[in-house]
Amino acid sequence: MSEHRIAMVGTPCEIMAASKLQHYTDSPIDVKLGLFCMENFSYKYFEHLLKEYDLKMDDIEKFQIDKGFVFLLLKTREIVKIPLSVAKRIIRKNCNICVELTSETSDISIGSIGSDDGWSTLIIRTEKGEEIVNGALEQKFIEAKELTDSRFNLLNKLAENKINKNLEEMKN
């Protein structure tokens, strides 16, 4: 066993690969923090898209997808709104066959779906994840409140939609 232990943050496909790695090698990965992910953009093509808006990666402070748009909060505090229909062309092709939204093989899943502004939704998936979250709460590094049933149902609905859409894509 490696003496160096690390925590890994990744999308569902990256977390799934890390989970498999833990079973077959002397993996240093001790904790897996999985992000919610509908799809991911190719970095190279995202840079090209930004050029169309006279922007660079370094200009962006925050990135958010909401209500059919990609919102870019720039360091200048300006907001750039790109229609998701335009951004769809730079989605990584392998995302069209991924059926995972919430990083189910992680210790803790994290995302904005179901969250109020300034908050993140956490799903604790393992004992290790529970220890980490409880420790962070005790140390007052984070605050927590329960996710309402309606917001939890929204998360489940979006996860189901992703599964159904991408299973259909795999048939074609």
Q: Where are the regions that the model predicts?
A:
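Long, compositionally biased charged/polar accessory segments in the mid-to-C-terminal portions
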Residues: 54-172
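Short active-site oxyanion
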Residues: 3-7
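Short, solvent-exposed amphipathic alpha-helical segments in soluble enzyme
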Residues: 22-26, 49-51, 137-142
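Short, charged, surface-exposed secondary-structure boundary motifs
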Residues: 39-49
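A short alpha->loop->secondary-structure connector
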Residues: 23-35
